[in-house]
C-alpha cells in the first residue's frame, strides 16, 4: 500500500482514494468483470486422450469441490464475488490473495479472499510463508494454501501496485476533479481580488473570515491568512489583500480553456497503466486500434489484457488447489473464454462448417461451444466428405456410400451431385 502520501500536486493518493477517480474505477471494473464472468470448471484428462468434466463427489474421478469452485467457493460468497474481489485487489495493490480451505485429505474445499493491505509474503532463513491479520489477530499461512495473483514484480514474490507506479497521474486526475468541482461551487466564476492601497483597519481585521465563514483566529496578522486562501482547497474563491480595497475580476486564462482536454489526457494516461482501450471507458476516442468494429476490439482486449490475468489464475489454482495425487490423475481447472472470443454468428458458422467438413468437430462439440444441449450419442460422430459419411464408415473398404444421401453443408448444383454419384457407381 502506498500509505496515502502527498504527491507533487498536493493530493494524497492511496489505493482506496484512487477508486474515487472514475477512470480508475472503470478500469478495475473492465478487467475484473470478465474474470468474474468466465465459467470456471474442473476437468480431468482421460488416459486415452481428451478431457472430461469432473463431477461433485468423493469417489474415484470425482472431487468434493468440483461444482462449488465455479458457483459457491465458500458459504458467504459466490464464485463471481471471490474472483472479482481478488482481481480488483491485484489491480489496485498489485497483489490479490485467496486462502484455500482443505479437508482431512488435504483436498481443497473452499476459497476465501484476504485483505491485500493486511497480507504479505514473508521470507526468512530460506523459508517462505504468508502473513495476514484477521480481526486483529496475526496468522501465518502455508504458501501452498494461498492463491497469490500478482502483477509485475521486481523480486517474484511481491507484485508492484499500479496505483503506486501511477500515483502522480492519479493525483492529477483527483486534483482536476476537485478543481472543477470548486469552480462550479463558486457559480462557475473564477473569482477575483479585493484590493486596497493601505492596510486594513482594526475593524476590517476583526471582520476577516475564513472561506467557511468562521472568524479568523489571529486578526492581528491578516497577512497570515493569505496563504490559507490559496491552493486547490480554495480554488476560485475571492482573495483578500490589503486595505484600500477594490474588486478586480480575474479572467479565465487560456490554460483554463484546456481544462476538458487536460482531463481527457489524464484519462488516457491512467488507461495506459491498466492497458484498457479508451473506447471501453466511454471516452471520446473515435477510432479503434484493432480492426474496424467493437467486436474485434473486444477480442483484442481479452487477448492482450484479460488473458494474462486468466493465465495467472489458472497456474496458481492448478498448482496449489490439488494434491499431488490429484495432479497425477489429471485434475485441473480452466476458465472458458469462448463466450467472449468466439466472434459473431456468421464468422462462427463459417468456422464450424469448415472444421466440421474435415472431421474436426462433431455436431455435439459444436453445440457445446454454443452452450447448447447435445443431440445424443449419435452427435459424437465425426464426418468427412463423400456425402458426409462418418470416419468409421469412410475407413471401411466394403462400405459403399448411398448416392441418394443428402450432401450436408454443401451448396453444389444437384445435377453435379447426381453426376458424381453415377461416376462412382460406374467405377465400382
Task: Tell what function each PLM region has.
Residues 1-259, 263-265, 269-272, 276, ...:
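Structured, contiguous alpha/beta core segments that scaffold functional sites
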Residues 91, 187, 215, 219, ...:
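Active-site-proximal structural scaffolding
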Residues 113-114, 129, 300-311, 344-357, ...:
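Short flexible/disordered coil segments
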Residues 278-289, 315-329:
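Short acidic alpha-helical/loop segments enriched in Asp/Glu that coordinate divalent cations
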Residues 309, 313, 329-333, 362:
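A short pocket-lining beta-strand/turn micro-motif at the edge of beta-sheets
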Residues 310, 317, 321, 325, ...:
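Short leucine-rich amphipathic alpha-helical surface patches
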Residues 324, 329, 333, 337-351, ...:
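Non-transmembrane, aqueous-exposed alpha-helical and coiled segments at domain scale
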Amino acid at each position: 500500500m502506498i500509505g496515502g502520501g502527498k504527491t507533487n500536486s498536493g493530493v494524497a493518493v492511496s489505493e482506496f482514494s484512487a477508486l474515487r477517480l472514475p477512470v480508475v474505477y472503470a478500469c478495475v471494473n473492465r478487467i475484473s468483470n470478465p474474470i468474474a464472468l468466465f465459467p470456471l470448471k474442473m476437468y480431468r484428462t482421460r488416459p486415452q486422450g481428451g478431457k472430461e468434466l469432473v463431477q461433485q463427489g468423493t469417489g474415484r474421478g470425482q472431487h468434493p469441490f468440483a461444482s462449488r469452485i465455479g458457483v459457491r467457493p465458500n458459504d458467504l460468497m459466490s464464485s463471481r464475488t471471490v474472483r472479482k474481489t481478488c482481481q480488483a485487489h491485484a489491480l489496485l495493490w498489485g497483489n490479490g490473495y485467496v486462502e484455500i480451505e482443505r479437508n482431512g485429505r488435504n483436498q481443497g474445499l473452499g476459497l476465501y479472499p484476504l485483505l491485500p493491505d493486511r497480507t504479505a509474503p514473508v521470507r526468512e532463513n530460506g523459508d517462505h510463508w504468508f502473513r495476514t491479520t484477521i480481526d486483529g489477530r496475526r496468522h501465518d499461512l502455508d504458501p501452498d494454501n494461498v492463491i497469490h495473483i500478482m502483477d509485475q514484480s521486481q523480486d517474484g514474490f511481491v507484485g508492484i501496485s499500479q496505483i503506486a507506479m501511477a500515483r502522480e497521474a492519479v493525483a492529477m486526475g483527483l486534483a482536476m476533479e476537485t478543481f472543477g468541482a470548486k469552480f462550479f461551487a463558486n457559480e462557475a466564476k473564477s473569482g477575483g481580488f479585493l484590493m486596497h492601497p493601505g492596510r486594513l483597519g482594526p475593524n476590517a481585521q476583526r471582520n476577516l473570515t475564513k472561506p467557511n465563514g468562521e472568524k479568523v483566529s489571529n486578526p492581528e496578522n491578516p497577512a497570515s491568512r493569505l496563504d490559507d486562501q490559496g491552493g486547490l482547497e480554495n480554488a476560485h474563491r475571492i482573495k483578500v489583500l490589503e486595505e484600500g480595497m477594490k474588486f478586480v475580476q480575474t479572467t479565465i486564462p487560456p490554460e483554463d480553456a484546456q481544462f476538458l482536454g487536460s482531463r481527457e489526457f489524464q484519462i488516457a494516461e491512467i488507461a495506459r497503466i491498466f492497458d484498457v482501450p479508451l473506447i471501453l471507458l466511454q471516452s471520446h476516442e473515435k477510432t479503434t486500434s484493432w480492426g474496424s468494429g467493437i467486436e474485434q476490439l473486444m477480442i483484442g482486449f481479452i487477448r492482450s489484457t484479460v488473458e494474462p490475468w486468466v493465465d495467472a489464475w489458472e497456474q496458481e489454482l492448478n498448482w496449489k488447489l490439488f494434491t499431488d495425487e490429484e495432479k497425477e490423475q489429471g485434475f485441473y481447472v480452466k476458465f472458458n473464454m469462448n463466450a467472449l472470443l468466439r466472434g459473431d454468428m456468421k464468422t462462427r458458422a463459417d468456422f464450424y462448417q469448415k472444421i466440421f467438413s474435415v472431421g474436426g468437430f462433431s455436431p455435439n462439440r459444436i453445440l457445446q461451444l454454443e452452450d447448447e444441449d447435445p443431440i445424443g450419442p449419435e452427435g459424437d460422430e465425426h464426418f468427412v466428405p463423400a456425402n458426409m459419411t462418418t470416419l468409421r464408415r469412410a475407413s471401411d473398404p466394403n462400405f459403399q456410400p448411398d448416392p441418394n444421401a443428402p450432401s450436408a453443408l454443401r451448396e453444389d448444383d444437384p445435377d453435379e451431385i447426381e453426376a458424381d454419384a453415377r461416376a462412382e457407381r460406374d467405377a465400382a
